[in-house]
């Protein structure tokens, strides 16, 4: 009897201990899961973003070293070289000696001291020497840049409703490029754009010499400090993250982002580099102008139908720039010690939303910095071709408000030319000295109402001239002048 009671009490104690062990294990497991979830939310989602890596002078000195090589070149090596390696009878352009185009000669002739007199340091190593010349303030350059940026902002606002040329359509097309956008991101819609109100300030411009094996005597480079702060340059977009498993668009997570530039500062490097290869030429679908032989034949046998193409052919050749000559380029980049501070606002979710997640801001900032460094941070540079600055009639314009003054001057020149030209026409209308012929053409045909190239009317008060002609393609002026109200023919010669 006593043994049965002791056995029952032992079994009961074992059952109670087993139940307690299961309850304790269950509670401990639940508590560990809760702690893990809490730690993940606190340290991963709402944790503070690590500070950006330092871009101080130490990083710049270790990754960006320049060698001032213009003083290391032997002045006795190399003599003056002509523009062509082989002499040619058709080369009438005088050769330019290399000593007149290297960096040392440029600095001497422009009274700019860019390199100190002691370029070598200890142990024969070359140190980075900036200009001993006083840095430029660049106030005038800031005004020009501010005007250019203001014009771009105004133009972008005027074209805001244009479906093809607006900045909104351009950004939307760039952000939704199917070759670069991942498949788990839905269409990106731009909701807000601010082009800012402030302007970058450039200062402390100095010239340094950079070792360049492709240039005789090195290459000159301008360093400009730039700073942009307290501006509202921003862009806001909306998109959705797509979950394509187990089937496409299984879940959609709306995301809204706003990126603003808080401050940007750095050192801008600008240098001129020659073109490595001539630009490619795409043939124009328009008919080609007459050749020189055709022009000679047309000038030798003039007809009413062939006079206008004959006179317009040299003009077309003058207006069109050469297609095979290489152009100079300007290269610009930023030193690695730049500073780009961004402000990223985020809103994730549809009903219960997460606002300003630090991890999202960190990812966006890293992507923006990577995009910027892959394009304009040394050793990568942006190369832009210099525009053609040769004066051409196709680009000639008149400032607003000066039309009347220009017209009066042109009218007076027309009247003087008419008085002087008509007095000589009676005797010389049929003959012309050989030295006054158009270059590349045959004998100059007599002028009449058909052979005039182009004319424009100038109206100043009661005077109106219909015969003022601009300079022809061959360099001569049309001498078929007449005054309204005068007799036709040779009566004006009297």
Swiss-Prot record:
Q: Where in the cell is it found?
A: Endoplasmic reticulum membrane
Q: What is this protein called?
A: Maintenance of mitochondrial morphology protein 1
Where is it mainly found?
A: endoplasmic reticulum
| Sequence ranges of Basic and acidic residues compositional bias | 425-437
Assembly and binders = Homodimer. Component of the ER-mitochondria encounter structure (ERMES) or MDM complex, composed of mmm1, mdm10, mdm12 and mdm34. A mmm1 homodimer associates with one molecule of mdm12 on each side in a pairwise head-to-tail manner, and the SMP-LTD domains of mmm1 and mdm12 generate a continuous hydrophobic tunnel for phospholipid trafficking.
Q: Where is the composition biased (Polar residues)?
A: 68-81, 88-99, 300-318, 406-415
Q: Which GO terms describe its cellular component?
A: endoplasmic reticulum membrane; ERMES complex
